[in-house]
Amino acid sequence: MLMNIVTLISWDFKRNNESFQRAIINGYDYWSRILDDHGVEKYVILLTCNRVELYYRGDPFDVQEKGYNIISDDMAINHLFHVAAGLDSMSIGENEVLKQVKQAYEKSSSMGKSDKFLSLIFQRAISVGKLVRSKTGIGKGKVSIPSIVYDIVRKNGGNKILLVGNGMLASEIAPYFSYPQYKVTVAGRNIDHVRAFAEKYEYEYVLINDIDSLIKNNDVIITATSSKTPIVEERSLMPGKLFIDLGNPPNIERGNNVITLDEIYEISKKNEMLREEKINQAEILIENEMKATMNKIKDLMIDDIFSQFYRFASVVQTMEIQKFRKMHPEVNENDLEALAHSIINKILNVPVTTLKAVSRSQGNSDFNRLFESFSSNFNDIVSAALQSYEGLRDTQSLRDRTRQLLQKS
């Protein structure tokens, strides 16, 4: 794990649906205020129908909304890569989430809330999402009944959905059709059961008294009950409507616009054979991109350290050139500056490239220890040097301070 690169606080439909339903009520401004109140300056907020994710530069902190998950650095980056690739979605490989990741990053960037680390992480995540889809075609085959139903509705249906039933299968399907993308009405025979079920997802609810009227007012009719007799008769199969029957025995009499549970099982079996191979391919791609991204992050961290040293070198360069010019006014100042700049770059290039090369062979935890020890003492030494030169203090104090710090390290 690298030091304070990115922290992620998240709620999502899979890990704790109840707390997620409370968190998703709040919009972008609410979460940005939470981050601002905790002194966070750089962040990206990803809000979708299925997740609330706060990526930010800073230490973990507690938030009022409970049930959240909190991870940091390489774990957070790995999670983002899986999200962008569609591996953490209800519908594996879906394209919409990649668009949402891109929009979240662009919004943060346009507001000045993204720095070079967040930019690197999100740009790489977007690239990973595109790469996984182009190399594996992972979004083309779903396995679970709810995800297959969701795919069918997304491709062929409208946005007004009648869900008949409030049992286990209905509860697995319900989270897929969140507001505002879909308007869902839950129907059943027991008003108390239907109300309790619908209120979990903030859906509308009705008694199933006039099925024809309910069918007329919706685009998609999904039945998932244990009724022993059909709920929808053949005469009620209105043209232009999509019927999905998940009942066993069947809830809907057969018709041309009825998709049955057996048909969905066949889709699932076919896709299951392809899915495992595609997920494995995607994981390999993500692992490779993670290694490349971690190395780039290490480079940025090392560059940050040496940028302070370059600043020190620039101060020394300016002052020494001024001294030299007093003794040799005939020398062209621009040529002298170019020469000095070239010498500094060539000298500092050796430790920079060496440290970057060493970091490639270090695990993240080993690099962390090395970096923390090196950067702490190095920054103290350079800060003392800068103060000495910029303040024109006695260079003897600089030598003494440097010697003490080196002995301490």
Swiss-Prot record:
Possesses an unusual extended V-shaped dimeric structure with each monomer consisting of three distinct domains arranged along a curved 'spinal' alpha-helix. The N-terminal catalytic domain specifically recognizes the glutamate moiety of the substrate. The second domain is the NADPH-binding domain, and the third C-terminal domain is responsible for dimerization. It comes from Thermoplasma volcanium (strain ATCC 51530 / DSM 4299 / JCM 9571 / NBRC 15438 / GSS1). Keywords: NADP, Oxidoreductase, Porphyrin biosynthesis. GO terms for molecular function: glutamyl-tRNA reductase activity; NADP binding. It comes from the Archaea. Substrate binds at T48, C49, N50, R51, S89, E94, N95, E96, Q100. The gene is hemA. During catalysis, the active site Cys acts as a nucleophile attacking the alpha-carbonyl group of tRNA-bound glutamate with the formation of a thioester intermediate between enzyme and glutamate, and the concomitant release of tRNA(Glu). The thioester intermediate is finally reduced by direct hydride transfer from NADPH, to form the product GSA. It catalyses: (S)-4-amino-5-oxopentanoate + tRNA(Glu) + NADP(+) = L-glutamyl-tRNA(Glu) + NADPH + H(+). The lineage of its organism: Archaea, Methanobacteriati, Thermoplasmatota, Thermoplasmata, Thermoplasmatales. Disulfide bonds: none annotated. Coiled coil: none annotated. This is Glutamyl-tRNA reductase.
